[in-house]
């Protein structure tokens, strides 16, 4: 990468971290989980971000309208559900990805209020470059007017959107991978627990079940590999994550927990490479 490209990558990452921090600051799901009985090993290393060539062509959305930004590699799409609810979402599609051909697709929930600007900024800062490098499609939905995706009123639309995406870019083996940060991590756990047959992995940074780390419904994740990242200073979320890890390990399921010591709710050292590496390790 030349010096200009390196500077651009650093600027994108720094800008994204500021915007993620602002978004996560509005999260209203503080943890009250029971203190865990185990502590995971710290993971304080991170791979430098990689800048990849942006996608310049893409198929049109399954319904509605879409726009593509060649400079950023991002597509803005609109999906209308059966009941008329409009969902805006952001996509990253590698330039060599063929429409109708199976491949890896990650469905990633944004943090905070899950508005479109936040959604775009997180995709741009955490998912885009590594997805283009590795050939992954990324789909990240902004919340509809019905509310955030950890609520039943909005979570019910997830299967419809997955079906629409699958018509264009079928996920490998018929199952999507799943990601989320903060409120998006809560949303990702809800989607995995509500529709476990649709997913093969779950990566959150951070996230857990709203019913706690000892939620009996975690048994539904038998066929979903789970990787969690949490800041060592993010006390409530760390406790919930540690208890989630213990519950899943006791069930004999595939799970990783990376506690990044010295970090708070926003894990600044975490890169797209870290996220995709974890996803590829745990995916079923």
What are these regions (language model features)?
Residues 90, 105-109, 137-142, 175-180, ...:
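Structural recognition of the beta-strand scaffold that forms the well-ordered cores
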Residues 201, 206-280:
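The feature captures the conserved acid-bearing segment of alpha/beta-hydrolase catalytic domains
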Residues 1-12:
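Bacterial N-terminal signal peptides that target proteins for export
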